[in-house]
A protein has these predicted regions:
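N-terminal subdomain of lithium-sensitive/metallo-dependent phosphomonoesterases centered on the IMPase/IPPase/PAP
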Residues: 1-86
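Short, well-ordered turn and helix-capping elements at secondary-structure junctions
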Residues: 35, 68-70, 86-89, 137, ...
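Glycine-rich active-site/cofactor-binding loop and its immediate structural neighborhood
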Residues: 77-119
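Acidic beta-strand-loop-alpha-helix segment within the catalytic core
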Residues: 104-162
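Short capping/connector residues at structural and topological boundaries
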Residues: 34-36, 44-45, 97, 145, ...
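A short, compositionally biased
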Residues: 26, 99, 127-131
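Residue-level signal for inorganic ion chemistry
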Residues: 19, 44, 55, 89, ...
Length: 162
């Protein structure tokens, strides 16, 4: 595994521990409503802090763009980590076990490494540019469908109105 992907995996798992603990203790979740069904919680902030700490420990010179903290400039602008510490905050708040930790690394403007971790199911999706994607260490492939009919599509709808 690429060393930077390894750090992303470690960071995602660390954040996942924060999220799972909070999910099992909903009375400790502090919620601020930003808009209709748009929340931020102490869990978002704590998970983000765990990710940032893990990345900065290994790569202090890298930049980070995080959902809650915004941009944290590093001394090497070629490396930029993109973090969504809790994708699915609304589900967490409502007790629905469908959320994930998402981390990507851009190098010179191109996404090179990515991790999506579902801490409830312990499903770890990883991808490296040019090497495909994996689920829990096993290669995954896309279907062969050429038309949208006959496929399964899942999406989330953003809460911000345009």
């Amino acid at each position: 595994m690429h060393p930077m992907l390894n750090i992303a995996v470690r960071a995602a798992r660390n954040a996942g521990q924060v999220v799972v603990k909070a999910f099992s203790q909903p009375e400790n979740i502090e919620v601020i409503q930003k808009g209709s069904n748009d929340f931020v919680t102490n869990v978002d902030r704590d998970a983000e802090a765990a990710i940032i700490h893990t990345i900065k420990k290994s790569y202090p010179e890298h930049s980070i763009v995080a959902e809650e903290s915004g941009e944290i400039a590093g001394t090497n602008p070629d490396y930029q980590w993109i973090i969504d510490p809790l994708d699915g905050t609304t589900n967490l708040v409502k007790g629905i076990p469908h959320f994930a930790v998402s981390i990507a690394l851009r190098v010179k403007g191109k996404t090179e490494q990515a991790v999506v971790y579902d801490p409830i199911r312990d499903e770890l999706f990883t991808a490296t540019r040019g090497s495909g994607a994996q689920l829990n260490g096993y290669r995954i492939r896309v279907g062969k469908a050429k038309e949208l009919s006959g496929t399964i599509l899942a999406t989330g709808f953003p809460f911000k109105q345009k």
